[in-house]
Amino acid sequence: MKVKYFAWVRERIGKPEETVEPPAGVKTVEELIIWLAARGETYAHAFETPRVIRAAIDHAHVKPDAAIAGAREIAFFPPMTGG
C-alpha cells in the first residue's frame, strides 16, 4: 500500500510517500502507526504522539481503529485548523 505523509509528519520522516507492506498482524490504522514508529528514529519521532495524528484511507478520514485491509493509500497528517 502507498503511505503518504503531510506537513510536519512528512518533515520528520523525510519523505512525502512510500510503498510499504506491513506484516499480516497489522490490521488497523493504530497498529500501522505502531509498526511504522518501530521502523527507525525518524518514524518514531514523527509518530511519538499518535493520538494527534490524523489518518485517511483512500481519501476518507478515518479513526485509529479503522481496518486497513484493501486500502490502496493511507495518509497521515497533523490536525487541521480552519479560519
Question: Over which residues does each language-model region extend?
Answer:
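Ubiquitin-like/PB1-type beta-grasp interaction modules and other compact soluble beta-rich domains
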Residues: 1-82
